Amino acid sequence: GQTVWPDHDMFHSSDTICGSLMARSKAISGGPVYLSDSPSDFIPDNILPLIDESGKIFRPSAPAIPTLESILTNPLQSGKDYRVSAPTGDEAVSIICYNLNTSPIHKEVKTFVSPKDYLVPKRTTGYFPADSILVFNWKKQTAEILATDKEMKLKGFTDCLFHLCPIRQGWGIIGIQEKYLSPATVQLLSRTNETLTLNVLCAGTLRIWVESQGKQELRSILIKKPGKIEISK
């Protein structure tokens, strides 16, 4: 198991350039979260997606690491995207794609997410093959089947957070959409072809992908308090 967890250092939630970017980097790093703002300057929109109502941090199952093609990349000067991934929750993999280039020449870079991004972490986390892979764009709050590489552009000093969620027995479990690490907000208790039982760890909007009788649906379920929930197709 993981014996050392990194400390990703402090950040300012009120930083107008990269406050939200740094918050997401803290989330996927798995390290502690601490702020350098004056409390009067705290930006709740950047802080609350990190934690539950009691202040407990939603963490990945292991610290994020660079994806294979990013290991030897200088993210500030390469002119390329920089990507990191971490296993999250019971079954998902979370990925952040960055444009961290400081030169105006590289104001826009191409990046991607791939079904292969889900396959790499399974070697160490015990994941097993899925029927298909769902990709959830956290910023846009949209989901789609990821059958091939999905390319996009990152404009400016920015990032994009994705969750790759396996679809098994017609269920794709995303989690609470308001939290950065959505898959870490739920625990899978049981799953059949007809029902899904979860332990939801915080209030918010639960997003579940459902496939039944040839139809696909991205459901939004309002969760008012943490606890066990059973969902039927």
Describe the role of every protein-language-model region:
Residues 1-44, 65-70:
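Glycan-recognition surfaces
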Residues 11, 34-35, 41-45, 67, ...:
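Flexible loop/turn segments at secondary-structure boundaries
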Residues 14-19, 23-27, 49-50, 83-88, ...:
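A general structural signal for short secondary-structure junctions and capping/turn motifs
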Residues 26-29, 34, 72-131, 161-168, ...:
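Carbohydrate-binding surface patches
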Residues 27, 31, 50-54, 138:
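Generic, well-ordered alpha-helical scaffold segments in large soluble proteins
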Residues 46-65, 69, 125:
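Active-site-proximal helices and loops of the catalytic beta/alpha 8
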Residues 135:
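Contiguous mid-protein beta-loop-alpha structural module that forms a pocket-lining wall or clamp
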Residues 145-188, 206-208, 215-233:
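C-terminal beta-strand-rich structural cap/linker in extracellular carbohydrate-active enzymes
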